[in-house]
């Protein structure tokens, strides 16, 4: 599900780092400071007369923000009308957000002029814009109005922190900060009002049952929200099955708004169910029970499709494993594979899933306060890392029992405990319903989505399983509306699609004889970054036209080495030492930017090609072989591809491919290394990319050893890694990367000539 808290942030990202400081500005000490409103108003007033007018639309958009923050509300309303006279928003989301801000400033103008209270004026504005809309448009606009201020507040706090030591800000920085403040002010003021207004509007559109109870095959119960369009005949149902409870009614309502029965069912134990909450374990059978229940209802035409992402993507595969007859199609996005990509990623436990357990299991509803307690979880990671205790000690350090996480630690292999949760091997052959999967190059669920896709096609060559992938994040375009800018990278206009719109177009095609979405013209549909173009292929392998082998060659300097077609000499190697006992890097933060000014080679080596003479396109997954000698029985490795741009910036090309070498060949069976003996380990990256590299760019492959405070640390003894401690780090890891290491790069254009 898409967190509402992100909708408002999407259009108000803060741009920091501009060199010119045109406006003196002393940032308030915190977002809670009573000085914030006046400081923002003063900054807006000073920016109004100096903001450039070279582009009329850009100027008017900026002027609206400045006038609103300066409390010139009537002027801001006039400016919005001027904007509408010369421009139409380029996306549904932008149109909706602009209506939210316009409604807000008009209500504030009424309050300021003493013609009405803010509550009264805003309520009238809200009803006026929502009443004439059809169900889909009313749903989208209501969703925009419902944006939660929590993450906007967090972003505002971070922005003030960045400028805390500065004496001034540039015009662009000031405008970004003021846009963020306007979003925070707007959604903080309207949030207490919107829920009741939307509920009032919903009553004339939908039949809503927020607590349907369904009996499972073993006698337990699960609860569900059911939303139907008023006056509708029997309809197909679109269902989500989830451990998350926030926004359940809205998710079901979205499907009802598009002419389906919307059902949002919960993992047993959530909502009104009295059973224990156990993530993953019973969702498949319980989802099957809900599907059978739906098919028996008088409002159902007997056809059920599933949708949703992340955990809600996993539950679709869990349900399909059991092949309920009423389940006619699934559309999983950014799907999780329990035991394979969460809470373990290819053998490595990730700390981020430790707070996820209380978030989803401590209460009947999502425990947002606990999950968002960054201070608690950051302290846990830091304390554990500095102490060098075993991974099992997280529970003791945190001071709160976590029997579920303890249970997960008992299953480090992809064993029967995990295998029974989703289709496994030959079970994929029996899944013969249409499947549409979506994910992103920068989606943390990328690995899981590609696992399902490749296994389904492997065991069922005739599988009707289609993939859509582009430059998307987990909560952005992989599941929802694409971002415009993602962690510094400006997404191509062609890639800015709305996965929810695709969802309903696809289900209309399957269930209502609508046209097939044009985007789905082949099995693999991918956007090529930098080319602003979608390509289509029959398979992942056919994304590219050629594969070129590049060898991880000799060292070029500190943490740098050559990547080239030339086979290195037999004695070529690169030595690396990682001291697992050294925790002086405790304040190191892994880079999050997709586009950045430098490459962080922490515990890694960057292998780089010579600059390309011609524009060069890479489409698909890297594969290759790592050839090395190490003094340990096991190690954890990370591989990330980058483009070093001609201007010296670095663009990350995909999500990180990280793995434990002992589980790379077979996730269900650990195979240790022999210290001091040469190892050659083939790999196929579980992450893919598509990017047109410009002439003058280099391909850079960052190969790193995992050692960080937010992941399990593999000390290499060969014992269960959860039992290892810093006492096992007496001898640093010493690895010699040998010259027969290589990667096979999937090019569309020949590397050397640039020919097609």
Locations of the language-model features?
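Accessory cap/linker subdomain of secreted extracellular hydrolases
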Residues: 134-188, 197-200, 257, 321-430
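N-terminal cap/lid segment of alpha/beta-hydrolase-fold proteins
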Residues: 193-233, 612-614
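Cap/lid segment of the alpha/beta-hydrolase catalytic domain
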Residues: 229-296, 478-491, 645-647, 658-659, ...
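Alpha/beta-hydrolase fold nucleophile elbow
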Residues: 298-311
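A catalytic-pocket lid/entrance helix-loop region that shapes and gates access to the active site
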Residues: 307, 314-381, 441, 460-504
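Short beta-strand/loop motif that positions the catalytic acidic residue
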Residues: 431, 437-439
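Active-site-adjacent alpha-helix of alpha/beta-hydrolase-fold enzymes
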Residues: 447-466
